């Protein structure tokens, strides 16, 4: 068991849990659900963890990639970063950054017929040497339920981009154009405060929300921000109506220099429990650990009257109300 995090019970009261819910180095998490079980992998692609409730996680002991797939991925890049798992049709797809440098990195596709893999190598989706986009990393793949179009959002120091994929999600669509969606290039913003990475898209009440992380992932400058658009191919704007591609985004979650939990970012998925409460996963540093590890946290996400998401106090919580699943 990675973490047994429930801390309080009461007659008729909702249980609480302690953060981090994954108390080990687990950066850039992606989480998916199938038949009542949650699965997660993270940067490094070491193993698959499973959970019944997003709080209690167990190491399955299963490698996410087959031996052949891992060898082919290693040939593409020394480092495996920021996986993204999504179901397309009857296949489970895994998208992974294979990284050597900001000018030599790409996004590669893998597939499996079961949610826990093993995922087999399919091939390259896009690469910095093909597009000239520095840091072709941090894939986010999704299918628009209104049109059926499959999209890839990605990027970091070369700014965030989107491009259409073919219906199988295994190649860039014929004639597709790479479009700048969010953030500035690091050459124009060396502090990285408006350089965005870790894209995640979420649909709610007729809006598409684009969650991003800005700052330096290794320190307290890292923050989660958000903007929204009516369509996946439209302009994403912050709460004031300013364009995300001009470097604007509404602050969602941050830390202060003295905080025990600092540098929250690169959020994973949002899940809604049986009570209708939304929860988001993200990684964060824990000063009390005495390490530079990035642990995975879980926290309730709320929505205001104008449809904008927010966290309680805008800070990382040491404990929160536990979600309810599968009872």
Task: List PLM regions with ranges.
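Carbohydrate-active catalytic/glycan-binding domains of CAZyme proteins
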Residues: 11-327
């Amino acid at each position: 068991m990675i973490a047994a995090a429930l801390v309080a019970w009461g007659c008729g009261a909702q249980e609480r849990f302690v953060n981090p819910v994954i108390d080990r180095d687990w950066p850039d998490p992606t989480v998916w659900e199938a038949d009542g079980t949650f699965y997660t992998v993270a940067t490094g692609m070491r193993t698959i963890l499973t959970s019944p409730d997003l709080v209690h996680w167990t190491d399955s002991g299963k490698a996410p990639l087959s031996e052949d797939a891992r060898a082919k991925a290693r040939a593409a890049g020394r480092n495996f970063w920021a996986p993204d798992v999504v179901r397309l049709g009857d296949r489970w797809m895994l998208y992974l950054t294979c990284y050597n440098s900001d000018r030599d990195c790409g996004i590669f596709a893998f597939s499996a017929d079961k949610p826990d893999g093993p995922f087999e190598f399919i091939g390259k989706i896009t690469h910095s040497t093909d597009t000239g986009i520095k840091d072709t990393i941090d894939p986010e793949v999704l299918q628009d339920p209104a049109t059926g179009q499959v999209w890839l959002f990605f990027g970091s120091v070369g700014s965030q981009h989107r491009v259409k994929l073919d219906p199988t999600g295994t190649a860039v669509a014929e004639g597709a154009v790479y479009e700048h969606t969010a953030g500035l290039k690091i050459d124009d913003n060396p502090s990285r405060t408006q350089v965005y990475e870790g894209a995640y898209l979420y649909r709610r009440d007729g809006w598409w929300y684009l969650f991003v992380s800005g700052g330096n992932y290794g320190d307290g400058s890292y923050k989660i921000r958000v903007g929204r658009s009516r369509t996946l191919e439209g302009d994403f704007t912050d709460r004031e109506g300013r364009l995300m591609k001009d470097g604007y985004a509404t602050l969602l979650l941050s830390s202060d220099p003295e905080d025990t939990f600092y540098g929250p970012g690169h959020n994973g998925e949002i899940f809604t429990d049986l009570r209708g409460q939304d929860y988001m996963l993200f990684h964060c540093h824990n000063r009390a650990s005495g390490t530079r590890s990035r642990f995975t946290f879980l926290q309730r996400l709320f929505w205001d009257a104008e449809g904008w998401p927010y966290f309680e106090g805008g800070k990382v919580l040491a404990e929160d109300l536990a979600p309810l699943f599968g009872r």
